[in-house]
């Protein structure tokens, strides 16, 4: 699956790495 920017941001945020 190819992640969109929104999905990537949400994934990182869920992991506690909010860099967007």
Curated annotation (Swiss-Prot):
It catalyses: Hydrolysis of (1->4)-beta-linkages between N-acetylmuramic acid and N-acetyl-D-glucosamine residues in a peptidoglycan and between N-acetyl-D-glucosamine residues in chitodextrins. The keyword ATP-binding does not apply. Keywords: Antimicrobial, Bacteriolytic enzyme, Glycosidase, Hydrolase, Milk protein. GO terms for biological process: defense response to bacterium; killing of cells of another organism. One of its GO terms (molecular function) is lysozyme activity. Lysozyme C is capable of both hydrolysis and transglycosylation; it also shows a slight esterase activity. It acts rapidly on both peptide-substituted and unsubstituted peptidoglycan, and slowly on chitin oligosaccharides. Belongs to the glycosyl hydrolase 22 family. Monomer. Lysozymes have primarily a bacteriolytic function; those in tissues and body fluids are associated with the monocyte-macrophage system and enhance the activity of immunoagents. This is Lysozyme C. It comes from Felis catus. The lineage of its organism: Eukaryota, Metazoa, Chordata, Craniata, Vertebrata.
